[in-house]
A protein has these predicted regions:
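Active-site entrance/lid segments in N-terminal catalytic domains of soluble metabolic enzymes
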Residues: 1-187
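Conserved active-site-proximal phosphate/metal-binding subdomains
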Residues: 48-65, 169-192, 198-306
Length: 306
């Protein structure tokens, strides 16, 4: 297997620190990096302007989020500052921030770089090719797979709707054969399957449908090494296959996550429509960071939201 480091939520400076830590401990063993450079994001076509991002958040969304917290006995102290601190998310998703992250990435001995929510930028493809680094792209539909293959990626990760995090609606069992058929015209592109894969029999089934291997993620969040909030880790272990939802409440794009009072609140009839990326993250990140901290200190209201 090949370990992949998820760096979507990190600044270029943080990424440098983390990759240096990895390099010091892997003793030359190969590893990969997963970034998030979406095709569609608010403010992409202009220079990064943090003040304009903050101004674009409707007051109603802020008040609704504060109301969710108050309903669980959590105050809103620090959320304004938290939104300012969360601007790194918008910066990372902006082309300028993405380029900074890629500059850091290619200074390290990564063997694979992956991107989600769109075709990798030309600069990623060119730098990767010059350094003999494989490029992977995550897709949730056969049409997306075709775009990625035409763009020149080396690996396509077909992630079914069961996948944790950002995902489409096509089930894994339907998506893998569809993408495998598309890639018959691109034999140089490898296919990995993802989405709800935990056991050996699920891996075997995925490969029987045409994938060369699998890409797993959520399953590792419950391991002893994972830095997952222990409250969330317990919820994941105890959850059944019916305890996840596909929600825009975290990032503004559909992502599969454990159902909680947080996701329920954003599905309520009185809830505002989640904002587009990255604005919804600026709303959710400071609130959920507070929930995460309080839940680990024993706050029952926060634990229900986590």
């Amino acid at each position: 297997g090949l370990g992949i480091f998820g760096a979507a939520g990190m600044s270029a400076e943080q990424l440098e620190t983390e990759l240096s830590w990895i390099d010091e401990r892997l003793d030359g063993k190969p590893y990969g990096l997963d970034l998030l450079i979406p095709d569609n994001v608010v403010g992409k076509e202009e220079s990064f302007q943090p003040d304009r991002l903050l101004e674009a958040i409707p007051r109603g969304h802020i008040e609704y989020t504060e109301g969710i917290l108050r309903g669980q006995g959590i105050d809103a102290v620090g959320l304004d500052k938290g939104r300012e601190e969360a601007l790194f998310i918008g910066r990372n998703l902006h082309p300028s921030g993405a380029e900074a992250s890629m500059d850091v990435a290619f200074r390290h001995p990564i063997r694979l770089i992956a991107n989600a929510l769109g075709v990798p930028p030309d600069s990623m493809l060119k730098q990767a090719k010059s350094k003999d680094v494989a490029v992977a792209a995550l897709v949730g539909a056969k049409e997306h797979a075709l775009r990625q293959a035409k763009a020149g990626v080396d690996i396509i990760v077909a992630a079914g709707g069961e996948a944790g995090g950002h995902c489409g609606v096509v089930p894994t069992m339907v998506l893998i054969p569809e993408v495998a058929e598309v890639l018959e015209e691109y034999p140089e592109v490898a296919l990995l399957g993802a989405g709800g894969i935990v056991t050996g029999r699920q891996m075997a089934a995925t490969m029987a449908m045409g994938a060369a291997g699998v890409w797993t993620a959520s399953v590792w969040l419950t391991t002893p090494e994972a830095e997952t909030n222990p409250i969330v880790k317990t919820k994941m272990i105890e959850a059944t296959s019916r305890d996840t939802v596909r929600s825009k409440s975290r990032t503004g794009k559909p992502s599969r996550q454990l159902r909680s009072l947080w996701t329920d609140a954003w599905e309520a009839t009185e809830a505002p429509e989640p904002l587009p990326m990255p604005l919804q993250s600026l709303v959710s990140h400071p609130a959920l960071a507070k929930v995460d901290k309080l839940s680990q200190s024993g706050h029952e209201g926060a634990q229900d939201l986590a």
